[in-house]
Amino acid sequence: MVILEAINVSIIPMENKALPADCLVYKHSTTCPVSTTTGQEVRAMKTDLPIYWINVREQRELSNWVAQIYNVVHESPQLLLIRGGKVEKVWSHYEVSRNCFSS
């Protein structure tokens, strides 16, 4: 498993349809300028939760699975806080920042 470079957090590229009960899921578009900015913010977050990173254009099936399993309308960029296996909070577009969540 490759951990993406980050300052204070563990960012794990999502590779299959499995997530822990408590985590963050970041949906990133490699062609979106807003995602470029928010991706930098995610890398600078301070949290004890693992962050699972999905590149939505290249991993459409995983992105759709997350939207379906957690009943969340797909947007990107998008950050989901998952606690106890359920979505507790969702941030989209410029709402995603290093300060939007702290554990």
Which residues fall in each region the model found?
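Short loop/turn motifs at secondary-structure junctions and domain boundaries
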Residues: I69-V73
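N-terminal "domain-start" segment that seeds a small globular fold
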Residues: M1-E15
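Thiol-based oxidoreductase modules, predominantly thioredoxin-like and allied folds used
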Residues: K27, L49-W65
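A short acidic, often aromatic-flanked loop/helix-cap motif at beta-alpha or helix-coil junctions
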Residues: I12-P13, Q59-L62, V96-R98
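Amphipathic alpha-helical interface surfaces
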Residues: V34-E41, E58, L62, V66
